[in-house]
Regions:
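Short, acidic/hydrophobic/Gly-rich beta-strand patch recurrent on exposed beta strands
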Residues: 30-33
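Conserved N-terminal beta-strand and adjoining loop/helix that marks the start
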Residues: 3-28, 46-49
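Charged phosphate-binding loop/patch that engages nucleotide di/tri-phosphates or the phosphate backbone
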Residues: 135-156
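A short gly/proline-enriched turn/hairpin at secondary-structure junctions
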Residues: 41-44
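Short, P/G- and charge-enriched loop/turn segments at secondary-structure junctions
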Residues: 2-11, 88-96
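Unchanged
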Residues: 47-141
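A conserved beta-turn-beta hairpin within the catalytic core of GNAT-like acetyltransferases
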Residues: 36-39
């Protein structure tokens, strides 16, 4: 597994990124979780101790897809989502931490690209039209971000 845990007794920081990777035609890249077949999502991951959020997004995109992007390639939506960490995952975080704060970014690709998924984390990928992608994802925050994508693209 290519996940690295943040410093501080090996516990994760309750701050993460969600990165929507999409084409100009609003096709959205989704990854299928290895441990949960049928669980589709965009790129996600936890911030490491000394990283800026854009660095976290760049690192997670590279780790989960093999796509090389720089901080300037990303669009920071200045949008955060706060959600409860499922009880079965709380042992990964400091004691008494029950919520995560997720920061949303997007990455525009000129066209669909071949993706190299991290086998320990994901079992496959698909490019879907944004409406289908919104229906396919498990997470409400991922769904809501995908549903905002057409408006975000028009306003950028």
């Amino acid at each position: 597994q290519r996940h690295r845990l943040s410093s501080g007794a090996g516990l994760k920081k309750p701050v993460s990124v969600l990165v929507l990777i999409h084409t100009p035609g609003l096709e959205v890249l989704l990854l299928e979780r290895a441990a949960h077949p049928g669980f589709w999502q965009s790129v996600t991951g936890s911030q490491e101790s000394d990283e800026q959020l854009a660095q976290t997004a760049v690192r997670e995109v590279a780790e989960e897809t093999g796509i090389s992007a720089g901080p300037r390639d990303l669009v920071d939506w200045h949008l955060t989502n706060r959600y409860e960490i499922f009880p079965e995952w709380r042992h990964r975080y400091p004691p008494a931490v029950t919520e995560n704060v997720e920061h949303v970014f997007s990455l525009l690709m000129p066209a669909r690209v071949t993706v190299s998924v991290s086998p320990g984390e994901h079992r496959g990928y698909v490019w879907l039209p944004w409406q289908e992608a919104a229906r396919a994802v498990f997470s409400w925050s991922n769904r809501d971000a995908i549903l905002m994508l057409p408006h975000r693209l028009r306003s950028d």
